[in-house]
């Protein structure tokens, strides 16, 4: 099912992240760098990622850098391949529902 608002690199930080594939590409905790999996939960300060061994890992948003994969079917119309977006975790520090509300405000005024 397509979302009403397409997920673009420019608006990813306002979207629901649960279900997206992710890789930690940098972190102040070196043991977190390189972790990859699917986001299964999100809090104000953490992303919970399920890795390929079905293990749940809690990753702090602050001081981490992530690479998200946006599947082609959720991305721009006509796009035939997945899009990869690098995001500083500090930009995600907010309760998910508040971040999602902000895109609705932007659309209203944009």
Swiss-Prot record:
The GO cellular component terms are: cytoplasm; ribonuclease P complex
GO molecular-function annotation terms?
Answer: ribonuclease P activity; RNA binding
Tell me where on the tree of life, at the top rank, the source sits.
Answer: Archaea
Report any Pfam family annotated for this entry: RNase_P-MRP_p29
Q: Which GO terms describe its biological process?
A: tRNA 5'-leader removal
Supply the EC number(s): 3.1.26.5
Q: Which reaction does it catalyse?
A: Endonucleolytic cleavage of RNA, removing 5'-extranucleotides from tRNA precursor
What compartments host this protein? Cytoplasm
Q: SUPFAM superfamilies, from UniProt?
A: Rof/RNase P subunit-like
Q: Which UniProt keywords apply?
A: Cytoplasm, Endonuclease, Hydrolase, Nuclease, tRNA processing
This protein's major location comes to cytoplasm
The record's family statement is: Belongs to the eukaryotic/archaeal RNase P protein component 1 family.
Known function: Part of ribonuclease P, a protein complex that generates mature tRNA molecules by cleaving their 5'-ends.
Q: How does it assemble?
A: Consists of a catalytic RNA component and at least 4-5 protein subunits.
Protein's UniProt name: Ribonuclease P protein component 1
To which species is this protein native?
A: Methanosarcina acetivorans (strain ATCC 35395 / DSM 2834 / JCM 12185 / C2A)
């Amino acid at each position: 099912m397509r979302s009403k608002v397409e997920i673009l690199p420019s608006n990813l930080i306002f979207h629901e992240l649960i279900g997206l594939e992710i890789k930690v590409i940098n972190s102040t905790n070196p043991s977190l760098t390189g972790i990859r999996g699917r986001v299964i939960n999100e809090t104000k300060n953490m992303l919970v990622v399920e890795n390929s061994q079905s293990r749940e890992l809690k990753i702090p948003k602050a001081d981490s850098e992530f690479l998200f994969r946006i599947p082609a079917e959720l991305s721009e119309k006509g796009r035939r391949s997945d899009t990869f977006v690098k995001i500083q975790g500090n930009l995600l520090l907010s309760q998910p529902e508040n971040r999602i509300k902000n895109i609705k405000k932007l659309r209203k005024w944009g």
